Amino acid sequence: MNNTIYKTALFLGLMLNTVNAQVINWANAGKEKHILNANIGAEYGVVFGLGYAYKLNHKLFPMTVGAEFSIPSGNTLLDDYKAKAGANVRWIKVHDFQFSTRVQGVFRRFENENAAIANFGLDMAGVVGYYRPKWFGGVELGFDKAIVTHFKHSEHYQEIYPEVKNGWYEPATGGNFYYGVQGGYTFRDQDIYLKFGNVVSQDFKTKPLLPFYVQIGYNYKL
């Protein structure tokens, strides 16, 4: 049974490389409260995403709360997807240098001919950047962790391995550290940004099938 879980978890590892969080220019806060986001990127494949954030203009610690949804390109819609919800807080501002952190709960689903896998996890990241009203750039370090995972094996797989069992399993299946750079340009009530970087598993020894991520995104503020 342990071997079965391990083999199935390898498929899940393709989904852990998910770094499509919204990028914000903290120096261009404005009075807008709503941020709509669309993005496209390459993680474990080509990924399309949409997001919404509500901005809280706290003078000391400005923050956004929101949700995101992404899906990879594929033949069957909603076989694989990821949903995230959480908060992004700017903690420190020294002249034009700013530091922020992001914490999001994550739900992922992945399905192939052997199993349908779903997990709940946590994505945490910190960004140090230089922010101007018209442009910004920074570096990001984060950790994406799968905490508890549900396995539902296909009938075909159960015929081959009749001892396999469906259900929730813990401890955590695994996680990835990711690090990279990001930058963007702001005009009026809109942002265009690019982010890219590398991914490594939590044991610091192995890398995912695609050990890097790239994303292009667009924000519209209302």
Where are the predicted features?
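Cleavable N-terminal export/targeting peptides
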Residues: M1-N28
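Extracytoplasmic loops and strand-loop junctions of Gram-negative outer membrane beta-barrel proteins
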Residues: E32-L36, R108-F110, Y161-G167
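Short glycine/proline- and aromatic-enriched beta-strand/turn motifs that initiate or cap beta-hairpins
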Residues: A21-G74
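Transmembrane beta-strands of outer-membrane beta-barrel pores
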Residues: I40-Y44, Y54-L56, F69-S73, V89-W91, ...
